[in-house]
Amino acid sequence: MYTYQGNAFQGITPTIDDEVYIAEGAVVVGDVRIGKYSSIWYNAVMRGDVDYISIGSNTNIQDLACLHVANNYPCIIGDYVTVGHCAVVHGAVVEDHCLIGMSATVLTGAKIGRGSIIAAGALVLENQVIPPNSLVVGVPGKVVRTADHIRDIHQQALKYKDEWAIQYGLHPDIEGEMYDGKTIVGTSRDKAE
């Protein structure tokens, strides 16, 4: 099994939970904190150099995504978040249960409210605040609707957690909610009881 601990930047090394999967080719540098059951996929880059990056639990950062910071602008990614292929999140806050679509860009100082979807290719401008449960499309990004789609995003995040855990045999009795391909089915402990 591939084991990755991250690279130091000015003496600061990443803090990566033992229950995290990091694919070969991914780069995690500096002040980066990654929560339990999250996954970082091929060639994704997280660079915590002039501020910190925090990634919550059960979150997946997909292939070629880039997370970076700016002075006084950390990059904070919540729990149960999917950051799609080639997406960029720069010095911004993404709250829990969000989906950042493929090749979307979230610029410095932006805040993405809980349960929101940023569509593929969308551009969230500097300091733009997206309300919770919003769908954002276009360049520049505009809220086109709000909806209660948190459950769908949550299921997507759980699907990634479950798939990497099973494929790599890392957590045969993985804790937390499970996704059976259609719905959230509770915890593995619930199933055992």
Where is each model-derived feature located?
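N-terminal segments that cap or nucleate solenoid repeat domains
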Residues: 2-40
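Glycine-rich hexapeptide-repeat left-handed beta-helix
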Residues: 1-11, 15, 49, 55-57, ...
